[in-house]
Amino acid sequence: MQESGYVPLKIADPALLFAELGRQPLPGMSLEEMADLMADLGEPRFRAKQLFQWVYQKGVKDFDAMTNLPARLRQHLAGTTMLRLLEKETEQHDRRTGTTKYLFRLADGSQVESVLMRQSWGNSVCVTTQVGCRMGCTFCASTVGGLVRNLTAGEIVDQIVMMQRELPQGERISTVVLMGSGEPLENYDHVLKAVRLVHDPEGLNIGYRHITISTSGIVPGMRRLAEEGLPITLALSLHAPTDELRRQLMPVARIWPLAEVLAAAREYGEKTGRRVTYEYILIEGVNDGPEEARQLARLLKGALAHVNLIPMNPVAERPQYRRPGPERVNRFKEILESNGIATTVRREMGGEIDAACGQLRNRAQRKHMGR
């Protein structure tokens, strides 16, 4: 059912891009699809599992590395398929936090950002689901320039595979968050296929409970995801405790009021048994005061909830918004916790990289345009 005022995203399927290139992308194919490919080539079914592992688990960049495949098959695949869908353009390191941000180029020349965070408990990655974004959140760099296109499931998964390759031998990615540029629930089919591929034991083998999907509050998508029966963590970008303020910050709030968004979030928690994470960006003088904290506490009272506070990262394209000082951040957190709301403050990426999502891509585009 179409919600009043909401026009579902209607753009060409990104998979058509590869049809135009005349090569079939291997990233994005399920084990069953690879089995069909092998059958079409007259190969035994077990070759599909071998190929699947080379593409996802081992992440090789050259068909010659697939040593357990016959030379004739490797040669055929090299001429008719694409093994990797991304090319690393640049990277930024923050030595203090062990965070690396990557800028990848896609087959059509588009660029996307991904982040690898190395931590004591494991390695996590933040990946992008769209080139650009049409949500129009006023504090976000990703929306500058609007939406270009959806990513395919293969392009989403390949970000993870490429970052897995960057880790020392013996280390692996343990947590995936789909919280980069774009609205994942507007690219639902490709995102869900990517999640299933990431989970596959023959591939990256990352448990559903270690995968998070973020949304700005696309209510039909939230309800649909709840019906999937997957124990994925849902992260809802809330960012304001009232409809009036949320509409100012997030155009999507003009379609679904807070009551409807929160009802969908509670439904998700009830159906999956997973605690919903509420993302809340703190903007100095806009939504970071004690009254906003008390309003947020009342809003989430009794819900299976965890609030993740995100002090505003500087965004060149959004100079009107500033980051609050530590005292205001801590005061906001204390008010929530005193009301029984589990709350954390997001770990800093650090000042050595463009921390805000979308910054690296925007800078590269400005450089390309000579600005």
Swiss-Prot record:
Domain of life the protein comes from: Bacteria
Positions of [4Fe-4S] cluster binding: 133, 137, 140
Protein name as annotated: Probable dual-specificity RNA methyltransferase RlmN
Disulfide bonds listed in the record: 126-357
The keyword Disulfide bond belongs to this UniProt entry's keyword annotation: yes
Binding-site residues, S-adenosyl-L-methionine: 182-183, 214, 237-239, 313
SMART domains: Elp3
Cofactor (UniProt): [4Fe-4S] cluster
Molecular function as annotated in GO: 4 iron, 4 sulfur cluster binding; metal ion binding; rRNA (adenine(2503)-C2-)-methyltransferase activity; rRNA binding; tRNA (adenine(37)-C2)-methyltransferase activity; tRNA binding
Cofactor note: Binds 1 [4Fe-4S] cluster. The cluster is coordinated with 3 cysteines and an exchangeable S-adenosyl-L-methionine.
Function description: Specifically methylates position 2 of adenine 2503 in 23S rRNA and position 2 of adenine 37 in tRNAs.
SUPFAM superfamilies found in the cross-reference section: Radical SAM enzymes
Domain Radical SAM core: 119-352
Pfam families cross-referenced by the UniProt entry: Radical_SAM, RlmN_N
E.C. number: 2.1.1.192
Additional notes on this entry: Reaction proceeds by a ping-pong mechanism involving intermediate methylation of a conserved cysteine residue.
Active-site feature positions: 113 (proton acceptor), 357 (s-methylcysteine intermediate)
Originating species: Symbiobacterium thermophilum (strain DSM 24528 / JCM 14929 / IAM 14863 / T)
A cellular component annotation (GO) from this entry: cytoplasm
Keywords: 4Fe-4S, Cytoplasm, Disulfide bond, Iron, Iron-sulfur, Metal-binding, Methyltransferase, rRNA processing, S-adenosyl-L-methionine, Transferase, tRNA processing
